[in-house]
Amino acid sequence: MAMHVFPLNIYRAMHKRDGAYALLEQMNGSLDKNAENIILQKGQQAPDGTYIVIVGESANRDHMKAFTPHYAENTTPWFSEMVGTEDVALGYKAYSNFPTTIMSLSYALTSANQYGDTSLKNAISLMDALRAAGYETDWISFQSRSSLASAAVTMIAERSDRTYWEQDPDEKMLDVIQKLPPAKKRVIFVHMNGSHYSYTSRVPEHRWNDFGISTQDPDHDYDVTLAYNDWIFKNVFEYAREHMHLQAMIYFSDHGENMVHYHGTSPFFFDMVHIPFFVYLSPEYRALYPELMVQLKKHAQIVFTNDLIFDTVAGLFQAKTNFYNPEYDFSSPQYSLTKEQALTFHGKEKISDDLGFHING
């Protein structure tokens, strides 16, 4: 495997021993080494086509009408429409594993999680598992490549076959996708700016009034970002389905958002880890693997934490390896996480302590 090159300040950050930067030290060299030990399970063959994984930013499902039907503002008209089809399942009890991006995605995009092996020294990246299964991988990011806050995510992202680091509004993801080189079977990852504060900077000014969010809404600016995201998802989905042989599309957020304290470790509130989780499987894909959507819909009201994205995507996309565990795969009949077992804040908080657990669905 070719050596991956990162900005110098990321490597300097590895010398820091505290907080998120300890993750960099754990991953440095380990991802390459562990990738050499990947063994793909036999009998898996996903069909050719395009598979999309969209990683949102600071999206709180409590503000998304598809997940919280009694919410006053229709922030998710496309999601809400799709929920009524046979092709889509939602995770109404989805949580982030940590209320910051770098800590959350370092687990979501690797085989490490809060329940089994928590050490990134022993982990592989999702990109490496997918490549072992015959996929080409693309990473499109609208966040910084070289900031220290995104260092671990950059290290994982750069394991993709191609990376694209954009400075435009999120809606430009469709332009980037349209210009990708042809690929027989590919997974496209998109990392959005999403709903990160400051909210007014996430939506182009000329689109601010396009989504019907009431000016009387106390969380107007935040809710506009969610409606803007929903519109983007619709555009990407329709293009990929029409022109790219779309087989599957997954969306989840890195973490949620509190309307007073935003997100972070102190103070901590559970809405900081309330996230959306959306899965689309094409009719063609469902015909090949009918049990997947059955299980996803069966688990819709069961707790899920996004450090299990690795196992779930591997299961959905037929990329199961010796690092895969069906008990952590939301699409598997063996999925076994319960509310009492579920954790966040990397094991320091119990989901069962969340007084808002029953707010969605």
How should each PLM-predicted stretch be described?
Residues 271-279:
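Substrate-binding/active-site groove segments that recognize
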Residues 32-42, 175, 211-249, 279-281, ...:
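A long, amphipathic alpha-helix that forms part
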Residues 128, 145-148, 238-243, 259, ...:
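Membrane-interface soluble catalytic domains
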